[in-house]
């Protein structure tokens, strides 16, 4: 059976920390979507490990790790991330596997990603992309012109000729669209000819890999990337990523049936953040937002960009839960709220004076909503490292209880600090 960890807001909720905790007792950790456009840091024995594309289960020496078919892979970044982990003492090459069906991100995808964003910014419609080429790669995938891992690693000499033909078609189509931008495609092709050999040992048929693990009754953890509000279908479109980041992406990104999923853990930051553009109803462009940003160290692992900050939005979480069906929640970074005398939570949206029955799909409406807040007294004490739920201040427990009751989902874990061990588990 599979347990799944998913982001419930706009990303950066702290999924990696929960995955790290759960990985102590699993056999397989799998990534199902996204690429190296997201990131998180895991601290083990005072050593920091930065993850972007690779599964966090690599920190567990007994865990096998799969980069699934729904992930898009920039091969140079794949090896760079692997080398960075190895430089910090992780021996993980024989525990890392890549789906033969995953699509490849090329440097020209990254170039055109930035060119497209520059075009949009002139009309003040920029998405806020990371520039990692993720969107253009999913675009070529959807148009059936993309290149998959098996196209690269097939040892048949004819396969390499086919790869080069596919590659040049993509380059030429981008040059027609954006002009003769500065790009040495021959140099990239030469690099990928070498990657044919170096990537091949990692490549597996991920459908067989996953179904063999399921048949053997292995404990499997699926690590979601990004979050529901960045989902290509259900997020704040077009200010989203280009993949399915919810429970649907788990099924399509790994090729597993719904009945194999046992638990869906929703990771929720105790307040709200987002990176990039797009409406953000509970955003606080004031001292509150600045405090959350500073105390929470809200800077992106991948881009270094400051994250926009605001109060917890339960309208977003109710919508997120309706789609993903969380069995329990992990509330992270509760300690960031320690110094607030008063804490607010968004509980409803009003548009033109009328309360909306659900989260609006139209961003024109979303940008105009008035948030209805419920105020809570803060606990105004340091909760860092508290390991028992019973030891939390009453006001903190009241805050958490309200979240549970509003969503109808139990809270199973609470993050009380940045350290790996600063995560208490609550009986549910």
From Swiss-Prot:
GO terms for molecular function: adenylosuccinate synthase activity; GTP binding; magnesium ion binding. Mg(2+) binds at residues 12, 39. Pathway: Purine metabolism; AMP biosynthesis via de novo pathway; AMP from IMP: step 1/2. It is an enzyme of class 6 (ligase). Binds 1 Mg(2+) ion per subunit. It is found in: Cytoplasm. IMP binds at residues 12-15, 37-40, 130, 144, 226, 241, 305. It catalyses: IMP + L-aspartate + GTP = N(6)-(1,2-dicarboxyethyl)-AMP + GDP + phosphate + 2 H(+). This is Adenylosuccinate synthetase. The lineage of its organism: Eukaryota, Fungi, Dikarya, Ascomycota, Saccharomycotina.
